């Protein structure tokens, strides 16, 4: 319907807020409980925007029903300029694109908006994509879906120690198949109007009509940090779509004082990633994880979520020497 023609960041925040308020009316046992918001990728916009709306609506309320405490985002779009700089740097430093393309990307794109790129930026992005080849951009070191028929996976299991156990690059294909089953749509009370086209994981109809997408979330970060809201940002370091370097440049632009300097955090005596605690924000990286961290590193992701909820920095090894 007309909803498809008027989407945007602002509408998404207000729709989500209306959903939360109505959901709490339906399930009142959850009213007044500590409430956190988390998301990844473009939810780097949705999560801070919804957080800001909840925070502002709670102002002056002594006992808010939506008892908002903090948010967490992963491999998140944060600030278009710094994200572009960090993304192109990641592609080049990880050997995905040529020197020439790297320079041209910097010239053509860095002052564009992520949602509305110029023609020149689009063009050179296509060149970059061709240079990268058929890799999984969301997880640059793991096989792509086409190659992992069950037969092949059995063959390579023993020979490739870097292939994460249990990661299946074909999840998107499965969900596309699943959500197009008539009985599934019926159970969801979806597609009651009999839409002639298939459900897709990423809809062009939506992105083509997207109305508003601010270039930066940093002003919201500043507002919520000042209000004492807990903010954690995490990043899987094998993602080239919203890579760690993009996140680091964006966070650096906040100029927050450091509380605990960069250190490795551990899971079962292995380095699981790195962590830096700033005043008002904690940054955690997850080693070897792609764009969707819990999909690639479920055990480490669980540890991350537990520490976020307890507001405890990520674990160091028992014998670690404090060198800073």
Curated annotation (Swiss-Prot):
The family annotation for this protein states:
Belongs to the peptidase S10 family.
Q: What is this protein called?
A: Serine carboxypeptidase II-1
Record: glycosylation sites = 10, 191
Q: What is its EC number?
A: 3.4.16.6
Propiece residues: 150-162
- Pfam families given in the database record: Peptidase_S10
Q: Where is the active site?
A: 41, 239, 291
- Entry GO terms, CC: vacuole
Catalytic activity, reaction form: Preferential release of a C-terminal arginine or lysine residue
Citing just one GO molecular function, the answer is: serine-type carboxypeptidase activity
The protein's matches in Gene3D superfamilies, at most eight in alphabetical order, are given as: 3.40.50.11320, 6.10.250.940, alpha/beta hydrolase
Q: How is it modified after translation?
A: The linker peptide is endoproteolytically excised during enzyme maturation.
- List all disulphide bridges recorded for this chain: 109-121, 145-170
Keywords of this protein's UniProt record, alphabetized? Carboxypeptidase, Disulfide bond, Glycoprotein, Hydrolase, Protease, Zymogen
Q: What is annotated about its quaternary structure and interactions?
A: Carboxypeptidase II is a dimer, where each monomer is composed of two chains linked by a disulfide bond.
**What's the encoding gene here?**
CXP;2-1
**Which organism does this sequence originate in?**
Hordeum vulgare
Q: Name one GO biological process term.
A: proteolysis
């Amino acid at each position: 319907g007309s909803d498809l023609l008027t989407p945007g960041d602002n509408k998404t925040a207000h729709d989500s807020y209306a959903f939360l308020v109505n959901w709490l009316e339906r399930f009142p046992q959850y009213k007044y409980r500590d409430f956190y918001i988390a998301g990844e990728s473009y939810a780097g916009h949705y999560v801070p925007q919804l957080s800001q709306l909840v925070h502002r609506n709670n102002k002056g309320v002594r006992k808010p029903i939506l008892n908002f405490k903090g948010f967490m985002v992963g491999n998140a779009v944060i600030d278009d300029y710094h994200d572009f700089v960090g993304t192109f740097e990641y592609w080049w430093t990880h050997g995905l694109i040529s020197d020439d393309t790297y320079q041209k990307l910097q010239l053509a794109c860095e002052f564009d908006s992520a949602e509305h790129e110029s023609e020149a930026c689009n063009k050179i992005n296509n060149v970059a994509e061709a240079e990268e080849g058929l890799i999984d951009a969301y997880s640059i070191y793991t096989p792509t879906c086409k190659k992992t028929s069950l037969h092949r996976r059995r063959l390579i299991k023993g020979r490739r120690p870097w292939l994460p156990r249990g990661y299946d690059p074909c999840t998107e294909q499965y969900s596309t198949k699943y959500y197009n089953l008539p009985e599934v749509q019926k159970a969801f009370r979806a597609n009651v109007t009999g839409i002639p086209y298939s459900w897709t994981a990423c809809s062009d109809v939506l992105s083509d009509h997207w109305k508003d997408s601010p270039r930066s979330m940093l002003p919201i970060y500043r507002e919520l940090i000042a209000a004492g809201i807990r903010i954690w940002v995490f990043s899987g370091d094998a993602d080239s779509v919203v890579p760690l370097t993009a996140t680091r440049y964006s966070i650096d632009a906040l100029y927050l004082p450091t509380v605990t300097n960069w250190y490795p955090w551990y899971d079962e005596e292995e380095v699981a990633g790195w962590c830096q605690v700033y005043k008002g924000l904690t940054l955690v990286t997850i080693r070897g994880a792609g764009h969707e961290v819990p999909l690639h590193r479920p055990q480490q992701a669980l540890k991350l979520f537990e520490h976020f909820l307890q507001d405890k920095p990520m674990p160091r090894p028992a014998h670690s020497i404090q060198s800073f």
